[in-house]
Regions:
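Signature of the catalytic double-stranded beta-helix
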Residues: 1-29, 35-41, 50-54, 194-197
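Residues that flank catalytic or metal-binding motifs in active/ligand-binding sites
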Residues: 18-20, 29-31, 42-46, 59-61, ...
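Short, basic/aromatic beta-hairpin or loop at an interaction surface
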Residues: 59, 66-81, 121
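A short, acidic/glycine-rich surface segment
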Residues: 30-35, 109-113
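Short, solvent-exposed aromatic-acidic interface loops
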Residues: 64-71, 188-192
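Charge-biased low-complexity segments
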Residues: 79-207
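Residues lining hydrophobic/aromatic ligand-binding pockets adjacent to catalytic sites
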Residues: 34, 63-64
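Short, conserved beta-strand element in jelly-roll/cupin
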Residues: 26, 39-56, 66-69, 93, ...
């Protein structure tokens, strides 16, 4: 049932058809995960916590992610102030029933767990990736009709993007009225990234 609800959530909110076979991980004394990026598993990664965080007997176990400012570190750099760890790394505690979804290209890891050798008291999580992004249709519109229009957008996209060095995925939800016009367009999820100097152009393109 959990798998079914997770898949349904990914379809509704991310535009991804499925999830990869999920993994169950248990972190005890000395376990950690160094900073890394997951490529090319899927456009979104997830971590669902089964950890009784409020009653934990260990230290550590937070999910760590580099902040965007670090990934484009020298843009707007100021040498007049010091920088603390919290400004470089985002920490997310694995609280019970928390679902964390993030762009797996961002370097991420897990802070080392110390304080328990008992697997019943460790950092317990289910994790994996949302995969297979593709169109979904609700209503009488046929898949064949929609796909023919989507294929026609391919050439137009090249003109819209131009030389913008964009990478990532964007998912949209929209309705089609009786005249065949798209309306009520909404961005569901967006992992597109560009160098900081080009972000205004990226925002204009996506929005």
């Amino acid at each position: 049932r959990f798998h079914e609800r997770l898949v349904a959530w990914g379809r509704e909110n991310l535009g991804c058809h499925d999830v990869s076979p999920p993994w169950l991980s248990n972190y005890v004394e000395g376990c950690r995960q160094e900073l890394h990026g997951d490529l090319p598993h899927g456009p979104w990664a997830f971590v669902f916590s089964l950890t009784n965080w409020k009653r934990r007997t260990f230290r550590g176990g937070e999910t760590l992610m580099l902040r965007d400012e670090v990934l484009d570190y020298w843009h707007g750099f100021e040498s007049t102030r010091s920088i603390e760890q919290g400004e470089l790394i985002r920490e997310i505690p694995p609280e019970l029933n928390r679902l964390v979804v993030f762009d797996p290209r961002i370097p991420h890891g897990v802070r080392q767990v110390t304080g328990t050798h008992d697997p019943r008291e460790g950092r317990l999580v289910i994790h994996g990736w949302f995969v297979q992004p593709r169109p979904f249709i609700q209503g009488p519109l046929s898949t064949k009709t929609l796909m023919s229009r989507i294929e026609g957008l391919t050439d137009q996209l090249g003109g819209w993007i131009g030389e913008l060095p964009i990478a990532g995925m964007v998912s949209l939800r929209f309705a089609v009225d009786r005249q065949g016009q798209a309306c009520h367009v909404k961005v569901l999820s967006d992992t597109t990234r560009v160098p900081a100097r080009d972000d205004k152009e990226r925002t204009k393109l996506i929005r």
